[in-house]
A protein has these predicted regions:
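Extended glycan-interaction surfaces of carbohydrate-active proteins
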Residues: 276-319, 343-365, 410-445, 483-568, ...
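Structural helix-adjacent loops and short alpha-helical linkers that scaffold large soluble proteins
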Residues: 274-283, 333-346, 386-409, 461-479, ...
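Extended amphipathic alpha-helical segments enriched in small hydrophobics
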Residues: 446-471, 475-478, 482-485, 567-603
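C-terminal capping/lid segments that line or modulate ligand- or cofactor-binding pockets
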Residues: 5-7, 15-80, 285, 318-321, ...
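Secondary-structure boundary elements
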Residues: 137-144, 338, 418-420, 462-473, ...
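Alpha-helical packing segments of well-folded alpha/beta enzyme cores
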Residues: 130-132, 227-229, 264, 285, ...
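Terminal accessory carbohydrate-recognition/targeting modules of carbohydrate-active enzymes
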Residues: 2-281, 582-585, 643-708
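Aromatic-rich carbohydrate-recognition surfaces in CAZymes
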Residues: 317-427, 447-450, 454, 570-576, ...
Length: 708
C-alpha cells in the first residue's frame, strides 16, 4: 500500500522502486473519481509562479521544480504573500523527477544521495490549512544519516480588499514563537503556524530572513518512513488549534479531504451534464473547462456571499468578482448553482455598475471604473437565469428600491431616450473596453457595444412579457438600432463593422469581439458573410487558437495577448464558437474550437488569455485560473449540442457534431425541470427523455414540451 505522496505505476510500487507499507497512511487510498482532473507534470507548461492548488478556503503556491517547497498562502481575508516553506536534505533541495496536479494536491518525487523522496502537498477540505507529507526511503544497502532542514519564513495580514492583484503582505512583519515541533509567525492581524512530527527538531535562527528547523533522520537500508508538516493560517488561536488537529491523525485528515474533494468532483458531474466524444480531446476540453466553476468557488464565512464565485483564485490572483467575467458564463451558472446565481445578480444590482466593474467580496462594495458591456452582461445573467430555471418570480424581487425587472429595463435603456428616435451611443474616450496599447484607438461609437444593445432590448422585452408586463416600448427599439448599425458603421469594402471616432470618421479595428454579435439577430446575412470572410489563417486564426485582433491590423501586438493580438481572452474562443453555432455556422465554429483543444492537455487550469500562434499563455497577470474559462464547456452544451430554453418553457435540441469528432453524447441534462440525454452522430441523433426516445436527422430540431 502506498501513501498519497507517491505516484503509483503498479500496486505496491513507485517509479523509484518498490514501496513498503506505511501504517500512518494505509487508509488514504484515493477513489477513482478523485483523479478526474489529474494532470501529469511532464505535460504541464504552467510556470511555478502561477502554479498552485485550492480548496475553497485556501490557495497555496507549489514550487514543482523541487519536492518540498511551498510559496504563498492566501486564505481570504488572511494571507501571507511571501510565505515560504522549504525542505532540504543534505543541505540542498531535492530536484523533482516527476509530479502531478489535482485541485487540492500536488505530488512530487525525487532522489538525492540514495534517498528516494516522495511528497504530497494537500489542502485539507473545509479548513484554512494543509499537510505536506514527506516519505523518505533509503534506496541503498547502507545505513544513512539524513540531515533535514525546514526553512520557514513569511509575513502576515488580514486583507480588507481583494480585487485584481494578489495581496502583498510584505510590509506586515511577524513575531516568531518557537515551541516543540511548532513555529508561530504572528502579529495583530493573526498568524500562520507550521508544525511537524519530525523528531528532535532544533530551531536555528541566523537572521530574521533566514531561519530553519534542523534534525537528522537515521535510516536503515531499505527503510521507508513518512513524516508530516502541517501549515495553517487565520486568527492565532484558531490556527494553532487547527495545526494540532491536522497532526493528531494526519492520515485520517488526508483521507477525509480526498473523499470530500471526490464528492466535489462528483457534484460537478451531477449538476452539469457529462459529455463524451469520439475525439477524446474534446471530452477532456469540456471537463477541464467545467472545473473552473469549482476552482473559483469559495466558501468563506467572511465574504458577503457564501458560496462566492471569484474571477480568479489560484495564489490569490483576481479574487474580486468582475461582472464581465462572471457574466461570460450566464447559461452555466443557473444549472450549476442557481441559488448563488440569484445572489450574485442581486449583489451586482446593489453596486452601481455604471461606475464600477467589480465588487470586493469582503464588504460587497463596487470598485474600479465601469466596463461598457456591463448593461448587456447583467441583462444576460438575469435572462438566462429565468429561462434556465423557470423562476419568473425572481423578476419581482426588490433590490435597492427597484424590482429585478425594473433594473433590467433601467440597464437596457441606459444612455437612451425612448421618447426620441433611436441613436447609436457615443461612449467617448473610454479606453477600458479593449485596453489597447500604443497609439491605436477603439472608442466613441462602438459597433459591438451598440450591437449588444439590440440583444439587451430583445431580452428585456421577453422578460417583461414573461412577467406579464406590456413590453411595447422595448419591442419597438431593436430594429431601428439594427438599421442604424449597418447604415452608420458597416463598411462594405472592408466587410467589417467600424467605429466612428470623435472626428466623425469611420475607422476599422479588426477585433474578434465583433464575432460575439453572431446569433443575436443584429446582423443581416451580408454582414455575417462579410465578417466570416475574415475568419482565416491570414487574419484571425493560427494553429493554436484565435487571435484577438487580425494579424493584418496595424494595432496587432504579439505581446498583448488578451485583446491586442497575440492570442485571445480565454472565454472568447468558446463564446464566439457558441455564437456561430447559434447563428447557423457550425463549420466556422468548430474550426475555431478545435484549435484550442490543446489547452486541456497542457494547462491544469486556464488563465486570463492563451496564445494563438504558440503553445503558451499570458504570464504578465495574476489571473491564472479564470472562472470564465468555463465558456468552453458552455459552448459544448449550448453550441455543439444545441440546447436552447425557450420563453415558452419548451426546450429545443439541435446538435452539431463536429467533423473532427463525429460521435458525441451529453447525458444528465437538467434544465428548467427537463431531464434528458442527447446522443448524436453526423447523420442523426436521439433525445432520451425518461422512457421516451425522440429521434431526428441532424439539422432538424427536437422540441421537448414544457414541464408542468
Amino acid at each position: 500500500m502506498v501513501v498519497p505522496g507517491t505516484l503509483v505505476t503498479e500496486p505496491g510500487n513507485t517509479p523509484l522502486g518498490p514501496s513498503e507499507p506505511s501504517s500512518a497512511q494505509e487508509k488514504a487510498q484515493p477513489p477513482k473519481a478523485y483523479d478526474m482532473l489529474r494532470m501529469d507534470g511532464e505535460r504541464i507548461i504552467t510556470e511555478e509562479e502561477h502554479f498552485g492548488i485550492i480548496n475553497g478556503l485556501l490557495t497555496a503556491g507549489i514550487n514543482y521544480r523541487d519536492v518540498g517547497t511551498l510559496s504563498g498562502l492566501y486564505a481570504p481575508p488572511y494571507a501571507s504573500s511571501d510565505f515560504n516553506l522549504e525542505l532540504r536534505l543534505f543541505g540542498e533541495k531535492v530536484t523533482t523527477k516527476k509530479y502531478d496536479w489535482r485541485p487540492i494536491e500536488v505530488r512530487r518525487e525525487g532522489e538525492l544521495h540514495g534517498i528516494a523522496v516522495s511528497t504530497s502537498t494537500l489542502l485539507t477540505l473545509g479548513m484554512r490549512g494543509g499537510i505536506l507529507a514527506v516519505t523518505l526511503r533509503n534506496a541503498t544497502d547502507k545505513k544513512q544519516d539524513v540531515p533535514v532542514q525546514l526553512g520557514i519564513s513569511g509575513t502576515f495580514d488580514n486583507v480588507k480588499y481583494w480585487g485584481f492583484p494578489r495581496p502583498d503582505t510584505t510590509k506586515n512583519k511577524t513575531i516568531i514563537v518557537v515551541g516543540q515541533g511548532r513555529i508561530i509567525h504572528y502579529n495583530s492581524a493573526g498568524a500562520f503556524v507550521v508544525s511537524s512530527d519530525f523528531n528532535n527538531l532544533v530551531w536555528e535562527e541566523a537572521s530574521e530572513w533566514s531561519s530553519h528547523w534542523v534534525t537528522t533522520v537515521v535510516m536503515r537500508p531499505g527503510e521507508r518512513r513518512t513524516h508530516y508538516i502541517a501549515f495553517t493560517l487565520g486568527p492565532r488561536e484558531e490556527a494553532e488549534s487547527l495545526c494540532d488537529r491536522l497532526l493528531k491523525d494526519p492520515s485520517d485528515v488526508i483521507q477525509r479531504s480526498i473523499e470530500a474533494s471526490t464528492r466535489k468532483n462528483e457534484d460537478l458531474s451531477a449538476k452539469l451534464p457529462v459529455f463524451e466524444a469520439s475525439d477524446s480531446r474534446l471530452s477532456a476540453y469540456y471537463t477541464r473547462s467545467l472545473q473552473h466553476l469549482m476552482l473559483n468557488k469559495w466558501t468563506v464565512p467572511e465574504f458577503v456571499l457564501n458560496p462566492y464565485y471569484s474571477t480568479g483564485s489560484i495564489k490569490g490572483g483576481c479574487v474580486g468578482c468582475y461582472l464581465w467575467d462572471y457574466a461570460s458564463v450566464p447559461e452555466l451558472m443557473p444549472l450549476y448553482d442557481p441559488t448563488a446565481a440569484r445572489e450574485h445578480i442581486k449583489q451586482f444590482l446593489r453596486v452601481d455598475i455604471t461606475k464600477h466593474f467589480l465588487f470586493n467580496p469582503i464588504d460587497g462594495q463596487g470598485d474600479g471604473p465601469t466596463y461598457l458591456v456591463n448593461q448587456e452582461k447583467i441583462i444576460g445573467c438575469i435572462y438566462y437565469y429565468v429561462l434556465h430555471t423557470g423562476d419568473v418570480k425572481f423578476l419581482e424581487e426588490s433590490v435597492n428600491g427597484k424590482s429585478v425587472l425594473e433594473w433590467v429595463i433601467h440597464q437596457a435603456t441606459h444612455g437612451d431616450d425612448l421618447s426620441r428616435p433611436a441613436v447609436l451611443v457615443d461612449y467617448g474616450e473610454n479606453v477600458s473596453h479593449l485596453e489597447l496599447r500604443h497609439q491605436y484607438k477603439y472608442n466613441h461609437i462602438l459597433p459591438d457595444v451598440n450591437g449588444g444593445r439590440y440583444a439587451s432590448y430583445v431580452r428585456a422585452a421577453r422578460l417583461a412579457a414573461l412577467a406579464g408586463k406590456e413590453p411595447t416600448h422595448l419591442v419597438a427599439r431593436p430594429e431601428p438600432l439594427k438599421e442604424l448599425l449597418k447604415k452608420t458603421l458597416w463598411d462594405p469594402q472592408g466587410k467589417w463593422l467600424g467605429f466612428q471616432s470623435d472626428k466623425g470618421e469611420l475607422e476599422l479595428r479588426y477585433s474578434n469581439i465583433i464575432f460575439t454579435l453572431f446569433g443575436t439577430g443584429v446582423l443581416d446575412q451580408e454582414m455575417e458573410l462579410g465578417l466570416l470572410s475574415h475568419v482565416n489563417e491570414k487574419e484571425f486564426l493560427s494553429d493554436y487558437g484565435l487571435h484577438s485582433i487580425s494579424k493584418l491590423d496595424p494595432a496587432y501586438d504579439q505581446v498583448d495577448i488578451d485583446h491586442g493580438g497575440g492570442g485571445s481572452y480565454v472565454a472568447f474562443p468558446g463564446m464566439i464558437a457558441e455564437c456561430l453555432y447559434k447563428a447557423g455556422y457550425p463549420d466556422h465554429a468548430e474550426n475555431i474550437l478545435k484549435r484550442t483543444l490543446w489547452w486541456a492537455e497542457r494547462l491544469p487550469y486556464w488563465g486570463d488569455s492563451i496564445v494563438a500562434n504558440q503553445i503558451d499563455y499570458r504570464k504578465d497577470t495574476p489571473l491564472q485560473c479564470a472562472m470564465d474559462a468555463a465558456a468552453g464547456a458552455q459552448c459544448v452544451i449550448f453550441g455543439i449540442c444545441g440546447i436552447r430554453a425557450e420563453t415558452s418553457g419548451e426546450i429545443t435540441v439541435n446538435p452539431h457534431p463536429p467533423k473532427f469528432s463525429p460521435n458525441i453524447s451529453l447525458k444528465g441534462v437538467n434544465i428548467r425541470g427537463a431531464h434528458f440525454d442527447v446522443i448524436a452522430n453526423r447523420n442523426d441523433y436521439e433525445v432520451r427523455v425518461g422512457s421516451k426516445t425522440l429521434r431526428s436527422k441532424v439539422g432538424t430540431p427536437v422540441v421537448i414540451a414544457a414541464s408542468a
